[in-house]
């Protein structure tokens, strides 16, 4: 109706394809996002069986991801907004201890730089990963798991954008299974995705 809601939030696009755009949502619209994020968190990470501490390595600002991610997950677990600060994340892990289950979130290039850091022995911590913002390959996920010293670490991609909101889609164990199969079988990959590249 052209009117701003009295309560809600305003996200801003990155401006990568032109001037940044403001996206205005009411609290009612945000409620759907909270429900989707809760499902994603508990379904993909079995969060009801773990004592997660989430370290948010997303960039913070007017964009849809950083601050909003923390606002959502603090309803379901303990969250610290470290932003994309490698030293802060390493310091936080050392301060909070090795007995916790950690979920570290961030963009793929940042996460690779983080886990390449020699400032901590990653293998001594129980870490799962949430990423998004750009695509990742099967090889990238293998590299991250190897860096963590845990071939069973969950490394999940979540999908969204400023205009449609964050976390509207996400990988599951089943979609990862299909992707792995296609990665190993080029014929199957083409039959499923009509391309020679693994998605």
What role is predicted for each listed range?
Residues 76-199:
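Active-site glycine/GP-rich loop and adjacent strand/helix microenvironment
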Residues 45-46, 71, 120:
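Short, flexible, solvent-exposed loop/turn segments with mixed acidic/basic and small polar residues
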Residues 26-40, 52-112:
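AMP-binding/adenylate-forming
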Residues 1-52:
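Nucleotide 5′-phosphate-binding alpha/beta core
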Residues 21, 60-61, 134, 157:
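Flexible, active-site-adjacent loop/turn segments at secondary-structure boundaries
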């Amino acid at each position: 109706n052209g009117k701003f809601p009295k309560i809600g939030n305003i996200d801003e696009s990155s401006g990568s394809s032109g001037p940044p755009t403001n996206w205005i949502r009411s609290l009612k619209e945000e409620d759907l996002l909270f429900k989707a994020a809760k499902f994603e968190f508990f379904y993909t990470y079995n969060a009801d069986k773990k004592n997660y501490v989430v370290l948010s390595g997303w960039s913070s600002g007017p964009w849809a991801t950083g601050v909003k991610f923390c606002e959502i997950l603090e309803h379901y677990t303990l969250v610290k907004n470290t932003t994309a600060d490698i030293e802060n994340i390493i310091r936080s892990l050392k301060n909070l201890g090795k007995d916790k289950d950690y979920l570290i979130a961030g963009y793929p290039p940042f996460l690779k730089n983080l886990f390449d850091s020699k400032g901590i022995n990653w293998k001594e911590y129980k870490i799962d990963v949430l990423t998004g913002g750009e695509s990742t390959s099967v090889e990238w996920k293998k590299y991250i798991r190897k860096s963590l010293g845990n071939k069973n670490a969950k490394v999940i991609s979540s999908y969204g954008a400023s205009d449609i909101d964050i976390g509207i889609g996400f990988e599951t164990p089943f979609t990862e299974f299909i992707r792995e199969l296609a990665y190993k079988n080029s014929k199957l990959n083409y039959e499923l995705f009509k391309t020679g590249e693994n998605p």
